[in-house]
Design a protein with these regions (language model features):
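Sec-dependent N-terminal signal peptides
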Residues: 4-14
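Periodic aromatic/glycine/histidine/acidic cluster detector
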Residues: 17-81, 86-94, 98-105, 110-118, ...
Length: 144
């Protein structure tokens, strides 16, 4: 938890101390030319790029994935979305590795499943739900 707070504080400090303008770099495009994968950056004094955010888009232009980058790696809360714009999943990365509680949702907003990651591995009790919100089952990922 301390690492998450530290990563968020570093990101806030970076943006508050920077006079640079956030710029967009389209890394990949869909076949129709629309943006697919975009990274946002500020330029360092030496002209190099310091990436601070990663966003992916569906072919139709709606956001699919979004989250912060620190030191070239995913750091902080990343979210994925359905084409409708509804939240699909939410989880934290530290130095590019999944860490902490993660949620996946049905398009209606109800939790589909939730669990914990430690050093990129599923651990503990994961809960799976029906689309109506009723608990379906619990699986102990430590016993696999």
């Amino acid at each position: 938890m301390k690492r998450i707070v530290l990563a968020v504080l570093m990101l806030v400090a970076f943006f508050s101390c920077s006079n640079d303008v956030l710029q967009e770099e389209v890394l990949t495009r869909h076949e129709d030319g629309n943006k697919k994968e975009v990274r946002y950056y500020v330029k360092n004094e030496d002209g190099s790029k310091n990436y601070v955010r990663e966003t992916w888009y569906y072919m139709e232009g709606m956001k699919h994935l979004d989250g912060p980058i620190i030191g070239g790696k995913r750091n902080g809360v990343f979210e994925t979305y359905y084409k409708s714009g509804a939240l699909m999943s939410k989880g934290t990365f530290i130095d590019g590795i999944r860490e902490g509680e993660a949620f996946t949702y049905y398009e209606n907003g109800n939790v589909k499943y939730q669990g914990f990651y430690v050093n990129g591995k599923e651990c503990g009790i994961w809960k799976f739900y029906e689309e109506n919100g009723e608990l379906d089952k619990e699986v102990n990922r430590d016993l696999r």
